Amino acid sequence: MGLSTATAKNLFVCLSFFLYLIFTIVPWRPVWAQNHKPAVSYEEKKRQANDIAVTVVVSGISCTCARFAEDIRNVVNDLGPDGIRVLPVLGVGGLQNLNDVLFLKNIDMAVVDEDNLRLLKKKDPALYANVEQRVQYITKLYNSEFHVLARNDIKSYDDLKDKKVNFNLKDSQTEVTADTVFDSLKIPVQRSYYDNDEAMKRLLSGDISAMIILTGAPQVTMAKVKKEDGVHFLPLDQDSLPNHDLHGLFANYLPAEITHDLYPNLIAEGTTVPTIANRALLVAYTWPENSQRYNKIAKFIDAFFSKIDQLNSPSRHPKWREVNLSAEMPGWLRFKPAADWLAAHRNQAVSANPDSTPGQSSPELRLAFQKLMQNYASSSGRKTLSTKERELLFARFIKILSESKAEAAAR
């Protein structure tokens, strides 16, 4: 049976439309595809991503160092092809962070503490013989206060004898410093190694008698508790430990204070808790000069140092006010790109706190401080002070001058 005229006409129309598609649209598909090729190839994008990335290993998220790394990332990051990208990495802290910089392939920088070089050399003199040549500091960041939070039945460090005390994670900076402190005091304790959150839970339940954290105050876990929880900070000074010789501790650590402003729920207004502190440093692995990794860290340093003033903001951690990029660290070598930047920017602010730096190294101020030291020596009977003791006195001297200036301006 043959096709009707209408059916044949419909088939002709369909065939014509199909041929139209083939000869008009299909030939243009290669042009369409060509116009939508990616701007860069997969391999090029991969190269760009790696070219701008630098890593910095910190401790846990409750550590002040982690907050600092986040602040640096937020201020410094530039994800353009020629920018710089900071990738914070959560580590353990302390000696482990320094080992991570030394031995892990993809770690460029770390936040460590000042005493780490000395402790590693003491631990294995052969392995770490030239560690100061392989890891060098970029800048000091802040002072890390030694916090010991104890139950109310514990009145002093002596009361912790044979009690359960949490030293934080193994090889963390807290554990390293706590080892030094309790060994120096010759107070034996039952040590545990819980993370901060677990330790706080066990402290409040009475399972342990005290927990220790070494970090820049305020520490977020401790800031959440209050006196009503039955805990308090233990003081660490000669008055609170009259039967102990603390000269060894204060030869290696800074005298410090924990204040009401830092922990208003734990410390009464107008009072302070004496303790010790360590210095937290930003350090880098010393890649060969002008190598790709070396140049990336140098680029990061330029971006970070150039924007240091942007970190003095209420939205940033209050410890940024302690940062002075030009501060020297005895026993450490400065990473060359950092030293070169400071030499080239002598007249530029090198502190996140504009009120903390100007004039502090002026000859007049140094002369006034020398007179203060002379008066101190004659009144106390002590003829010499350690570098750390002089630094603390000078900091207090600056504070007194600032307060006097503010009072005079208010009159």
What does each model-identified segment do?
Residues 1-11:
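N-terminal secretory signal peptides that target proteins for export/translocation
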Residues 13-27:
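Bacterial N-terminal signal peptides
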Residues 36-111:
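N-terminal (or domain-start) structured segment
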Residues 51-79, 84, 143-205:
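Bilobed "Venus flytrap"/periplasmic-binding protein-like clamshell domains
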Residues 73-74, 87-129, 200-202, 219-226:
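Pocket-flanking alpha-helical
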Residues 114, 124-125, 187-290:
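Pocket-lining segment of extracytoplasmic ligand-binding domains
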Residues 131-145, 226-228, 275-278:
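Short Pro/Gly-enriched coil loops immediately N-terminal to beta-strands
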Residues 274-377, 383:
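Segments of small-molecule ligand-sensing domains
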